[in-house]
From Swiss-Prot:
Expressed by the venom gland. Changing M19L: 1.7-fold decrease in ability to inhibit sodium channel Nav1.7/SCN9A. No change in activity towards Nav1.7/SCN9A. Changing W30L: Important increase in selectivity for Nav1.7/SCN9A; derivative JNJ63955918. It is found in: Secreted. Changing W7Q: Important increase in selectivity for Nav1.7/SCN9A; derivative JNJ63955918. SUPFAM superfamilies: omega toxin-like. This is Beta/omega-theraphotoxin-Tp2a. Changing W24Y: 180-fold decrease in ability to inhibit Nav1.7/SCN9A, and decrease in ability to bind membranes. The ability to inhibit Nav1.7/SCN9A is greatly enhances by unatural modifications such as C-terminal amidation (5-fold) or C-terminal addition of -NHCH3 (25-fold). Such modifications also improve the ability to inhibit Nav1.2/SCN2A, but the selectivity for Nav1.7/SCN9A over Nav1.2/SCN2A is retained. Highly resistant to proteases, such as pepsin, trypsin, chymotrypsin and elastase. The toxin is not degraded in the plasma and shows fast clearance from the circulation.
Length: 30
């Protein structure tokens, strides 16, 4: 499942974007 704080920018890891688990995510500048 996915949570708002589960952010990972890894091609092999899932990333949470809009409460949806994806296999990719855009790199974000904090």
């Amino acid at each position: 499942y996915c949570q708002k704080w589960m952010w990972t920018c890894d091609s092999e890891r899932k990333c949470c974007e809009g409460m949806v688990c994806r296999l990719w995510c855009k790199k974000k500048l904090w």
